Amino acid sequence: MNKKIKIAVGVLLVSFCFGAGVLFASFYQPEEKTLQLYSNALKDFKNEEYQNSYYLFSKVGFLSKLKPYAIYHQAQCAKELGDKASEMKQYQLLFNAYRQNDLSIRAKYLAGQMLVDENPEQAAKYFKEIIKKHPSTDYAIASEYYSGIILLNEYKNKSVFPLSVKDDVEMAFRHYLEKAPQGRHALNAISNWLTLSKEISKDDYLLMANTSFLFEDYEKTKELLAYTDLKDSWVLDVKNSYALKNSSRARQLVQYGLKNYTQYVEEKDIYDAVNVYMNLSNSKKYDIDVLYDISSPKGKDYIWSLKCDAASAEYQVECYKKLYLNYPNSLYGANAMANLFFDRIKKRDYKNAVKIGKDYLNKFSSGNSAPMVMFWLGKVAERNNNYEEYMEYYKRTIAEFPDNYYAYRAYIALKHLKTTLLNASIKPQPVEYPYKNISKEDVIFKLAQLQDYNMLELTTDDEFVKSWIYYQKGEYSHSMLVARDAMEKLTPRPERSDLRWRLVYPIDYYDEILQYSGENDSTLMLALMREESYFNPNAQSSVGARGLMQLMPATAQEISSQYGFGMTSYDDLFKPELNIKIGNAYYSQLRNALDQLDISAIAAYNGGIGSVGRWKNNVKYSDTDEFVEQIPYMETKNYVKKVFRSYWNYLRIYIKE
């Protein structure tokens, strides 16, 4: 081999090695460097330094699990910079190179959105692929809308608009409204649909009217309802008339609908109509009787239950008996059975109480009243000195309904405690990511570690993870609501050490509670605050109660003046520390006036101290449990149970061992 050939070969080898090295470096990247690049890019994005953010995200290695998320961020940077070509390029790279990634569907959808006007044929192709391959996603629902828009735009200015194409446009809008009646494109779907020069069915007008109502456009709803069939639309017409303050029409429609058209609507719709009627009532007992007399069997169990609830004590039991016999398998039939069960307990007819209670648990083991029935079967067994039986019922209540108010009462009974509060305190723990067993290699863990919460929200369907994201973003009330609803769906409930519980029962403002609770139980005050405001310092009720502990301004002003707390305006109640200080002082006054009885004080915090005094004088009870069950004001009875349920759960989750 001569010298020139050797030199050429050497140059080629060096070039190859250099190129391979560059290629290797672009694919392989140390984890530490990847995280640093992503973190810095995210920081620049939040600081609106989009050019630099785009560049840093582009440097994330191709082999990194974070690469598709970096590409998506690049597209968002390009969007902020007004660079449509780069935005489209990144979306296409994402859904072509990372087809298995959840973001690929979103990327294709966003690309389709961008092309609706510029390249409708390509946009339609993208939307069609989404509908076909991912039919159960929100992106598929929105793609239906855009498919209709693209077809409409193609033909609306042509001399011939075939009826078959109009049918396709109509079908696209119909599917969208059926699946997303409150979707972001819903009102546009209606307005575009109405431009089609074709006959629209009564059912479709009802579909449009329902969406308009959900968007609180009551006049438009009224206009659309005029084209519907009353037998199908009477409930919506009732609700819309109520919203328009047309009380006479709303009442007339309820009566007419209950008499003639209940078979055409769902039971829950009948309940809504009845509730509107009762909201307009000046004589609830009379109006319940009117509705009861005219209603057909469907949905009558709800009206019957209202009739029983409003009946005098001497007629109530017979009313519940008839309700249960006529609707033995319905929700309200089950509630009637539970009321009959407790009536036997009040009358000390334990033999029949046990029979009814056992029948209830056999038929409705997961019914709303199952924890109450199970607990009271334990109380009856204890009163009958049946040790093994009452121990079994109390333990079952705790095991099957661990986070329920009756689990708390069962624990008190098991331990033979004479007090309402437990001799225990909590050790505050922070809200954490809700799953312990997540791998550090999991991309979800990496995104959480990088605090890329918006990206996490896009890539997860887990409600607890979403709750955690909202908490990290400072949306505490929203976080709790999402976690609470998610936990209600879990059967059985997870162990008390499960991190998901901390999202349902987070600890906020506890230092301030400790500082100002005085002789009040700090855990109980935490529970009260949770139920009053979900830790929203700016909460304001319809009657004017304000802040974390939902204090009425006049009451708060009186307490502040009495103790010299320095409240100068009602808006001061939105200041967390002052609200907690005044709220604890107020609760302490209630507690002192009610012989240090916390259940009575909690009832008074909601229903008023005068009401509690009257109830104690008028209700026959032998212990705390009988008193709570017989609080005549349903809101207060439920409030007491909610607060002590929260109290119990805070102790379960955070108890200081």
Language-model-derived ranges and their functions:
Residues 636:
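Short, flexible loop segments at boundaries between secondary-structure elements
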Residues 568-578:
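A short, structured beta-strand-centered segment in the mid-to-C-terminal lobe
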Residues 2-543, 549, 557-562, 568, ...:
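Acidic, polar-rich low-complexity tracts and alpha-helical solenoid repeat scaffolds
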Residues 409, 629, 639, 644-657:
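Acidic, low-complexity, intrinsically disordered peripheral segments
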Residues 520-537, 580-584, 599-607, 643:
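Short, functionally critical alpha-helical segments immediately adjacent to catalytic or ligand/cofactor-binding
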Residues 589-618:
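Catalytic and binding regions of secreted/periplasmic enzymes and modules that target cell-wall glycans
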Residues 549-551, 580:
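Short glycine- and hydrophobic/aromatic-rich loop-to-beta-strand nucleating segment
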